[in-house]
């Protein structure tokens, strides 16, 4: 699948991180809408899986860096380095959101403080995804230095996060209308298809003296088709019951999540496979 497979730790880190951010926002809205403490507590217990996935993502990122010490060293240039900003933003999001979950799950969270804390965690998640996109806005890598990168990362949030949250809320047996979020995911899929087409067309005009962007991943078109098929199948696991006015089963939602994550990981592998440099970067 092109040259992007060697960046599999980053594929896992970015996709899972973006999925968790989207799921925290939607499940958090469900938590706000819960009618009693028992419902809220069941939602909080289900949110354990968000922080489990976030932990897996961070373990993958450490594997990419080689050792935990390098992760600490990479924080030396916060404010000046995109990588430092990303790791700092992700660590703060993980710490603040994870601590909210821990205090909430043991039942020690005052409701007013819990609402403010959760809202703050959601905002930190959005900042984390934004910092992720900034890492790849490198002017000497024209295949990444564009709006498609930013769109792709935030579309992953909208594609994978809501269905994970829907599974958590359904497993918690909470009455909550997830249809608006399913519609948002469908709109994100349409936008994703548009990005795929436009970016594919733009590759023909990107080249260096030794490389042509369109030749970096020969199977780009066919793999993107498979990606869209997986995304459609995954969303179908959520949409079909809703169209029939039935509640989706947790197993169906989990299957849909797996299919969507698989599709987004294919897209992210292609993203890393499109890496190419033009000119020289000058450190500031």
Curated annotation (Swiss-Prot):
<feature type="topological domain" description="Cytoplasmic">
    <location>
        <begin position="108"/>
        <end position="115"/>
    </location>
</feature>
<keyword id="KW-0997">Cell inner membrane</keyword>
<feature type="transmembrane region" description="Helical">
    <location>
        <begin position="223"/>
        <end position="243"/>
    </location>
</feature>
<keyword id="KW-0812">Transmembrane</keyword>
<feature type="topological domain" description="Cytoplasmic">
    <location>
        <begin position="31"/>
        <end position="45"/>
    </location>
</feature>
<feature type="topological domain" description="Cytoplasmic">
    <location>
        <begin position="170"/>
        <end position="180"/>
    </location>
</feature>
<feature type="transmembrane region" description="Helical">
    <location>
        <begin position="46"/>
        <end position="66"/>
    </location>
</feature>
<protein>
    <recommendedName>
        <fullName>Anaerobic dimethyl sulfoxide reductase chain YnfH</fullName>
    </recommendedName>
</protein>
<feature type="topological domain" description="Periplasmic">
    <location>
        <begin position="202"/>
        <end position="222"/>
    </location>
</feature>
<feature type="transmembrane region" description="Helical">
    <location>
        <begin position="251"/>
        <end position="271"/>
    </location>
</feature>
<comment type="function">
    <text>Terminal reductase during anaerobic growth on various sulfoxide and N-oxide compounds. The C subunit anchors the other two subunits to the membrane and stabilize the catalytic subunits.</text>
</comment>
<feature type="transmembrane region" description="Helical">
    <location>
        <begin position="149"/>
        <end position="169"/>
    </location>
</feature>
<comment type="similarity">
    <text>Belongs to the DmsC family.</text>
</comment>
<dbReference type="GO" id="GO:1990204">
    <property type="term" value="C:oxidoreductase complex"/>
</dbReference>
<dbReference type="GO" id="GO:0009061">
    <property type="term" value="P:anaerobic respiration"/>
</dbReference>
<dbReference type="GO" id="GO:0005886">
    <property type="term" value="C:plasma membrane"/>
</dbReference>
<feature type="topological domain" description="Periplasmic">
    <location>
        <begin position="137"/>
        <end position="148"/>
    </location>
</feature>
<feature type="transmembrane region" description="Helical">
    <location>
        <begin position="87"/>
        <end position="107"/>
    </location>
</feature>
<feature type="transmembrane region" description="Helical">
    <location>
        <begin position="116"/>
        <end position="136"/>
    </location>
</feature>
<feature type="transmembrane region" description="Helical">
    <location>
        <begin position="10"/>
        <end position="30"/>
    </location>
</feature>
<comment type="subunit">
    <text>The complex consists of three subunits: YnfF, the reductase; YnfG, an electron transfer protein, and YnfH, a membrane anchor protein.</text>
</comment>
<keyword id="KW-0560">Oxidoreductase</keyword>
<keyword id="KW-0472">Membrane</keyword>
<feature type="topological domain" description="Cytoplasmic">
    <location>
        <begin position="244"/>
        <end position="250"/>
    </location>
</feature>
<keyword id="KW-1133">Transmembrane helix</keyword>
<feature type="topological domain" description="Periplasmic">
    <location>
        <begin position="67"/>
        <end position="86"/>
    </location>
</feature>
<feature type="transmembrane region" description="Helical">
    <location>
        <begin position="181"/>
        <end position="201"/>
    </location>
</feature>
<feature type="topological domain" description="Periplasmic">
    <location>
        <begin position="272"/>
        <end position="284"/>
    </location>
</feature>
<feature type="topological domain" description="Periplasmic">
    <location>
        <begin position="1"/>
        <end position="9"/>
    </location>
</feature>
<dbReference type="GO" id="GO:0009390">
    <property type="term" value="C:dimethyl sulfoxide reductase complex"/>
</dbReference>
<dbReference type="GO" id="GO:0009389">
    <property type="term" value="F:dimethyl sulfoxide reductase activity"/>
</dbReference>
<dbReference type="InterPro" id="IPR007059">
    <property type="entry name" value="DmsC"/>
</dbReference>
<dbReference type="Pfam" id="PF04976">
    <property type="entry name" value="DmsC"/>
</dbReference>
<dbReference type="GO" id="GO:0019645">
    <property type="term" value="P:anaerobic electron transport chain"/>
</dbReference>
<keyword id="KW-1003">Cell membrane</keyword>
């Amino acid at each position: 699948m092109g040259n992007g497979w060697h960046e599999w730790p980053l594929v896992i880190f970015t996709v899972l991180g973006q999925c968790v951010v989207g799921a925290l926002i939607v499940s958090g809205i469900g938590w706000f809408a819960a009618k009693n403490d028992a419902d809220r507590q069941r939602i909080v217990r289900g949110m354990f899986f968000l922080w489990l996935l976030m932990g897996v993502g961070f373990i993958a990122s450490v594997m990419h860096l080689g050792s935990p010490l390098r992760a600490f060293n990479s924080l030396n240039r916060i404010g000046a380095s995109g990588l430092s900003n990303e790791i700092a933003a992700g660590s703060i999001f993980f710490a603040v959101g994870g601590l909210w979950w821990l205090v909430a799950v043991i039942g020690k969270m005052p409701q007013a403080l819990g609402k403010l804390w959760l809202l703050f965690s959601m905002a930190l998640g959005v900042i984390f995804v934004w910092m992720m996109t900034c890492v790849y806005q490198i002017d000497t890598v024209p295949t990444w230095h564009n709006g498609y990168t930013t769109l792709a990362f935030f579309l992953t949030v909208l594609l994978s996060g809501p269905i994970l949250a829907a599974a958590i809320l359904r497993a918690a047996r909470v009455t909550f209308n997830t249809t608006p979020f399913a519609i948002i995911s469908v709109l994100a899929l349409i936008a994703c298809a548009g990005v795929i087409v436009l970016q594919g067309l733009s590759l023909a005009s990107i080249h260096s003296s030794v490389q042509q962007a369109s030749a970096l991943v020969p199977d780009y078109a066919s793999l993107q088709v498979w990606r869209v098929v997986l995304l459609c199948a995954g969303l179908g696991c959520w949409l079909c019951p809703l169209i029939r006015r039935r509640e989706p089963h947790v197993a169906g939602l989990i299957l849909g999540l797996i299919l969507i994550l698989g599709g987004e990981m294919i897209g992210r592998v292609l993203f890393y496979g499109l890496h190419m440099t033009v000119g020289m970067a000058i450190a500031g």
